[in-house]
Amino acid sequence: MKKERYEIVAEYLECTATASASTANLGPGYDVFGLGLDVLQDTVSIRIERKTIANKNNVKIIMKGDMGKSIPNDLDSNSAGKVAKKIISDYNLYNYNCLIEIRKNIPPGYGMGSSAASAVATAVSLNALFGLNIDDTKLLDYSAEGELASAGVKHFDNIAGSFFGNFVIVKTYPNLEFIRIESPNNLTMVICVPLIPVPKMKTEFSRKVIPQQVPLEKMVHNVANACSVV
């Protein structure tokens, strides 16, 4: 990409994006099904300012809101930070100071795609600010970098639900692909958030206890159940 495509002449630019909560798996659709929710949103505001000397320590994160108090603001432990770090590295955007302010409204650790929402809003904001013209598939791939902070691996189900809304099927082989299905107008979701503390990195721990191999019979049952959902 040529530098002039994302050259910024103003003293600073700012962009704000919101991304919705989501739920994923929906029973048999592990890492495949995502569903956008309209109950809560994270808001990410990013301000970039041109500087004369390149510096790789050019990103600062500020967490706001009660839901953000337990979330670290260092880049490698924050989903928005992971996304920003990857995009800035890939496009060599070290000549800009980048301030990321996250208004966290989605409770982390309760299966509502809290990390995914912040990651999606960050990717969308950076794409707009720098005029990178990243397509949707690649934008979601960047957003999934944020899941490394909470899950230890890239997965796309919550990311897709937050980005596209409605019901989304994720295909990762042979290429990353998303199939969006409009949800019925009369579909109602009941969200219950238990008032109990959850451990840090809960998602990463939960994924580690899932068996790596399952009997063929169980796989067939699961595929049938997944097809029934669709």
Identify the function of each model-found stretch.
Residues 81, 85, 119, 123-127, ...:
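Residues within alpha-helical segments
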Residues 53-63, 112, 180, 201-208:
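Short, charged, solvent-exposed linker or helix-capping segments at domain edges/interfaces
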